[in-house]
């Protein structure tokens, strides 16, 4: 399993001959190295409905005939836009041709905001995402606060790499993320969701220096690790 980071919360997984993107916020993302028009993808996994996570999903899914795996309400909302979706919910898992996906809890919001009409559409509960393929497991926490059931996520899953938000303000900050890393018991922890906007500026290297009993890895946009 090859895993690459592409700024903000964008993670690409290459496994079993398939390409999977998590939270593909590309257009308007100052920290990504990817251009939507150049991306080839087989499946898109979404943690929640905010614009900086749904991003280019509709365009990418239509262009590549990719399936979008998302919480039920968000999947339904996107299906109305002509996207091929697979709805799931927290606690549920499903075997796809690239591997197994399971949704976990995340403490955040989830909505689609229409600035022009000044409306907010509820898109279900936010989620974290577990992907297991080639006997390796990745945990993408989505946008979330620290919560004690992260201990359970760590106990139930042998996590090889965890992507944890550290930006603060909208998610947990670095101090809480250090505790989250301890609880999820991942072998490797990669910080995400930081420095995209001024309000979430953080030093990822200071964060990884504080980690214990795991390997902290700062990935620049386009860099990857192989599990």
UniProtKB/Swiss-Prot annotation:
From what superkingdom does this record's organism come? Bacteria
InterPro entries according to UniProt? Metallo-B-lactamas, RibonucZ/Hydroxyglut_hydro, UPF0173, UPF0173_UPF0282_UlaG_hydrolase
NAD among the record's keywords? no
For this UniProt entry, the molecular function terms from Gene Ontology, in alphabetical order, are: hydrolase activity
Keywords in alphabetical order: Hydrolase
The keyword Translocase is annotated on this UniProt entry: no
Q: Which SMART domains match?
A: Lactamase_B
The molecule here is called UPF0173 metal-dependent hydrolase BT9727_4343
Cited NCBIfam families: PRK00685.1
Species this chain originates from: Bacillus thuringiensis subsp. konkukian (strain 97-27)
Q: Which family does it belong to?
A: Belongs to the UPF0173 family.
